[in-house]
UniProtKB/Swiss-Prot annotation:
Residues 193-195 are annotated as: G5. The keyword Nucleotide-binding applies. This is Elongation factor 1-alpha. Residues 69-73 are annotated as: G2. Residues 90-93 are annotated as: G3. Mg(2+) binds at S20. The gene is tuf. It is found in: Cytoplasm. It is an enzyme of class 3 (hydrolase).
Length: 435
């Protein structure tokens, strides 16, 4: 495991804009992929006559290895730059990608948004149905302020490597981001050609008009997030394994506090108590884990069937909050008609996804000022900002956003789409017995 500081990175963007190729390029140039795997991917791509697809094949190979593998794969995808050690969480291309992005984004420290500059592709991504738009909105909700936009496929613009097209995309995407509250002075743009690696790890000979940093240099300008070590322990569980000869091994990322070997811990909402026998990250044993660490930990006294993805770990003297009801400030991002009391979307918060019923529309807010514009509105429609109360249908752990940001921001999904996004301003706790 590298001694460099570690950052979690997510790669987002519209389908077919070149996410896999970009990730493959980074991993090949700076990653931990052995030559053999690269050769196999190249041969598989050649057989199909798709030389340029070798990166996507490479990722598929890694994904298969991951799915077949018995190892707890927190290795995800790793690469190093001069300054940092990166883990790419959730390689793209999943049909559950938005769902994964919601849970993944809540663990990410930074994002690369891949946008194709090719005529028609860029426009599709920015259309109302487009994922470029959807992912920008979700990145904002999930608190991802560190964003690098890789404007890809610059070799396919008309004419190729067209500076005018690049500038037009930078302007439009920046404008859209500003409308959702991004500080675009902090967003970085770079024109790239992923298969060839132009402006990714080396300067492009084809775009002399661009003299800014490469993607890799931008990655080194990212900032490390503050580590909330002095806050109470919170670890949203991503997966639970039962490993023969070892026992129960939950996997997740420490969001706040410190977990030490020997600690007594509680899993909420189940209320199950166990003791930490060992902790590891990227196959390296550790005595303690801090915020930002992706870990697997072996627990004595808890069985795999007792706990699941979406549970949250804390210490018994300050257990994670189970919500009877919670109040949130939401923005309705998409809805064909209107939503009223009783509406029940699926709430995706940290690694959990639970249906929650709207129990009260408290007020509608003026989006510009945040002041109350209407008390107890009858319904909400697309574009509305409101204070709403939700009642979870099944036990759910959430926290106030200002106390534990990663456990207090969420997305509302329905009909396969993101309906809204929000942050939790208040939680009415449910009584749970800790046993």
């Amino acid at each position: 495991m590298s001694q460099k500081p570690h950052l979690n990175l997510i790669v987002i963007g519209h389908i077919d804009h070149g996410k896999s190729t970009l990730v493959g390029r980074l991993l090949m140039d700076r990653g931990f992929i052995d030559e053999k795997t690269v050769k196999e991917a190249e041969e598989a791509a050649k057989k199909l006559g798709k030389e340029s697809e070798k990166f996507a094949f490479l990722l598929d190979r890694l994904k298969e290895e991951r799915e077949r593998g018995v190892t707890i794969n927190l290795t995800f995808m790793r690469f190093e730059t001069k300054k940092y050690f990166f883990t790419i969480i959730d390689a793209p291309g999943h049909r559950d990608f938005v769902k994964n992005m919601i849970t993944g984004a809540s663990q990410a420290d930074a994002a690369i948004l891949v946008v194709s500059a090719k005529k028609g592709e860029y426009e599709a991504g920015m259309s109302v149905e487009g994922q470029t738009r959807e992912h920008i909105i979700l990145a904002k909700t999930m608190g991802l302020d560190q964003l690098i936009v890789a404007v890809n496929k610059m070799d396919l613009t008309e004419p190729p490597y067209d500076e005018k097209r690049y500038k037009e995309i930078v302007d439009q995407v920046s404008k859209f981001m500003r409308s959702y509250g991004f500080n675009t002075n902090k967003v970085r743009f770079v024109p790239v050609v992923a298969p060839a690696g132009d402006n990714i790890t080396h300067r492009s000979e084809n775009m002399k008009w661009y003299n800014g940093p490469t993607l890799e240099e931008y990655l080194d300008q990212l900032e490390l997030p503050p580590k909330p070590v002095d806050k109470p322990l919170r670890i949203p569980i991503q997966d639970v394994y039962s490993i023969s000869g070892v026992g129960t091994v939950p996997v997740g990322r420490v969001e706040s506090g410190v977990l030490k070997v020997g600690d007594k811990i509680v899993f909420m909402p189940a209320g199950k108590v166990g003791e930490v026998r060992s902790i590891e990250t990227h196959h390296t044993k550790m005595d303690k884990a801090e915020p930002g660490d992706n870990i697997g930990f072996n627990v004595r006294g808890v069985e795999k069937k007792d706990i699941k993805r979406g549970d949250v770990v804390g210490h018994p003297n300050n257990p994670p909050t189970v919500a009877d009801e919670f109040t949130a400030r939401i923005i309705v991002v998409w809805h064909p008609t209107a939503l009223a009391n009783g509406y029940t979307p699926v709430i995706h918060v940290h690694t959990a996804s639970v249906a929650c019923r709207v129990s009260e529309l408290v007020s509608k807010l003026d989006p510009r000022t945040g002041q109350e514009a209407e008390k107890n509105p009858q319904f909400l429609k697309q574009g509305d900002v409101a204070i709403v109360k939700f009642k979870p249908i099944k036990p759910l752990c959430v926290e106030k956003y200002n106390e534990f940001p990663p456990l207090g921001r969420f997305a509302m999904r329905d009909m396969g789409k993101t309906v809204g996004v929000g942050i939790i301003v208040d939680v009415k706790p449910a009584k749970v017995e800790i046993k």
